[in-house]
Amino acid sequence: MNYIISFKNLILTVVLLIFTVHGSSAEKSIALGYEPKYDTGFVHFDYVDPTSTKKGTIRLSAFGTFESLNPFLLKSLAPAGLNDLVFETLMERSLDEPSSSYGHIASGYNLANDGLSVTYYIKDNATFSNGDSITSSDVLFSYSTLISEVAHPQYRIYWADIKSVKILDEKSIKFIFKRKNPELHMIIGDIPIFSRKWLEGKEFDQTILEKPIASGPYIIDSFEPGRYITYKRNQNYWAIEEPTRVGMYNFDYIKFKYYKDMTVGLEAFKAGEYDYIFENHSKRWARDYSGPNFVNGSIKKLQLKHDNNAGIQGFIFNTRKEIFQNKKVREAITYAFDFKWSNQNLFYNQYQRCTSFFSNSELSANIKPSDNERKLAKKLSIPEKKVINKNLSFIN
């Protein structure tokens, strides 16, 4: 009897251990170098409207062509929107943090204490568009396909530090690392997951025009290579109430129409063939956005303030060349460039002088030193005048 009781207790302990590993002990988010913004149990991202109505059609433009419904190849072109609308990943990156991910297809993960492996756990309700449950076998198949010689080489480079992969059970999969890599457990969460049924009887590196079987919020409704593609919101989408999807993907249909070049595309927009255009060319913005539909209000021309990193545009010195290794030469050329005249006469006063490689973000350098910069300069015995001149010399 004592043996039977002990055995039952052992079974109970094992069951509880499995439950703990798959449930409460698994990490739900990843943030590199800081605490994640969203707590476990968050309802939705702050940048979405959870009350958004789901209806309507939006018509967009794309340029060039497409020839395959496989977005994971180097040699063929896939249609606009395919990766973002049809395929999904284990984790979902948030758009209001520098580098954070939250469980999406995966409910969570466990990073080994030695940092040499990570185990991901797949949500029980995660399904593909054909209704099949997503399993660890699908994750392994997707990963193995993407790092093969026939896929785009970027994937082999991206996950080069993965030594091996082991399926633990139907919903658990373990990735073993070659060496410690502080980002690897996060970028494993970026693996796009698709069903092996999509590729049955096909060569992955050949042109594939069969509609993908994946887990995203949209499925392909209709398409004509090089002409258009229309995505339809999946009415049976598994993640519609997941916090990583609430308030997102609200259009019933998203259609991309293809144009051979920007000039033709802009004229098509002005004629009302699609609904939205983003312009980054100062001359076109200043001279070409006019016509009857602008006058009658059918088209609204707006400049919207945003907080996205704008990057940098300019002349970059190749300091491997001897002439540019002299700092004073580089500084003299910088002074010789008349930005004010160029902006007025070439760029229609549309540009602002870049002051940082991280323009329009909290990481950018300010013209005036911050309080912390002043304190650091004082601590290092650097005169404040030098700190100010250092900043100003970049833009003057």
Please annotate each region the language model reported.
Residues 164-167, 221-232, 257-321, 332, ...:
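Extracellular/periplasmic solute-recognition and catalytic clefts
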Residues 121, 155-200, 217-224, 374:
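Surface-exposed binding/hinge segments that line
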Residues 325-396:
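Append "and occasionally in soluble cytosolic enzymes with long acidic Gly/Pro-rich linkers
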Residues 27-29, 55-64, 107, 117-120, ...:
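Short, well-ordered beta-strand elements
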Residues 10-20:
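Bacterial N-terminal signal peptides
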Residues 38, 48-53, 75-82, 108-152, ...:
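Aromatic- and charge-enriched surface segment that lines or borders ligand/interaction sites
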Residues 26-114, 121, 144, 213:
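N-terminal lobe/hinge region of extracytoplasmic solute-binding protein
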Residues 87-97, 188-253, 260-264, 271, ...:
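Gly/Pro-rich hinge or "lid" segments in bacterial periplasmic/extracellular proteins
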